[in-house]
């Protein structure tokens, strides 16, 4: 017996299946930095939709599989590494002019100290769309700490999207990290 016969609401037309690009991933990353920075007041943040409907995970309507949208990764990393005490970094950065907000710093960042794991995670976004920006961090309060991993989410094309079988935007580990004592 067909399950839709008794429960026709289980089959619904595709609605609000927005496809997100790299630009959206940057915005989500910036939003999460703000939420973490204000975690003394914001106690819970969640996604209302997880699959297909304005969501970070999409499925093939023919049952062919699923894929992660560009916005999946900032949420994943914030969930995995954003546990602990939010640290308010002092940001000294180059700046650039915007049409609506005047001059803003190129770097937006927050750090999280996980005492249990003895880890500090720095979340940072380069807001300068024209130039690469070097991020220097001073971790003198965490003597003996070393870089365990440097993960980046990057693309030269702000409008690039992911699709089934085409993961154009995904995090990668980079070796472009140096540490001075």
Task: Give, region by region, the residue ranges found by the protein language model.
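Aromatic/acidic polysaccharide-binding cleft in carbohydrate-active enzymes
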Residues: 2-109, 115-118
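Short beta-strand elements of extracellular/lumenal beta-sandwich folds
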Residues: 119-125
């Amino acid at each position: 017996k067909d399950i839709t016969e008794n429960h026709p609401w289980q089959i619904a037309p595709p609605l609000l299946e927005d496809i997100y690009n790299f630009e959206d991933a940057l915005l989500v990353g910036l939003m999460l930095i703000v939420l973490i920075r204000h975690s003394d007041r914001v106690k819970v943040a969640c996604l209302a939709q997880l699959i297909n409907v304005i969501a970070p995970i999409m499925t093939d309507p023919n049952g062919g599989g699923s894929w992660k949208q560009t916005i999946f990764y900032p949420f994943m990393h914030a969930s995995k590494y954003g546990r602990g005490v939010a640290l308010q970094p002092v940001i000294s950065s180059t700046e650039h002019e915007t049409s609506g907000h005047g001059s803003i710093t190129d770097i937006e960042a927050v750090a999280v100290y996980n005492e249990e794991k003895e880890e500090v995670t720095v979340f940072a976004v380069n807001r300068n769309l024209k130039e690469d920006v070097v991020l220097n961090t001073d971790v003198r309060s965490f003597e003996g700490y070393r870089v365990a991993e440097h993960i980046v989410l990057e693309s030269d094309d702000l409008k690039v999207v992911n699709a089934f079988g085409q993961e154009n935007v995904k995090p990668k580990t980079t070796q472009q990290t140096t540490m001075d004592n």
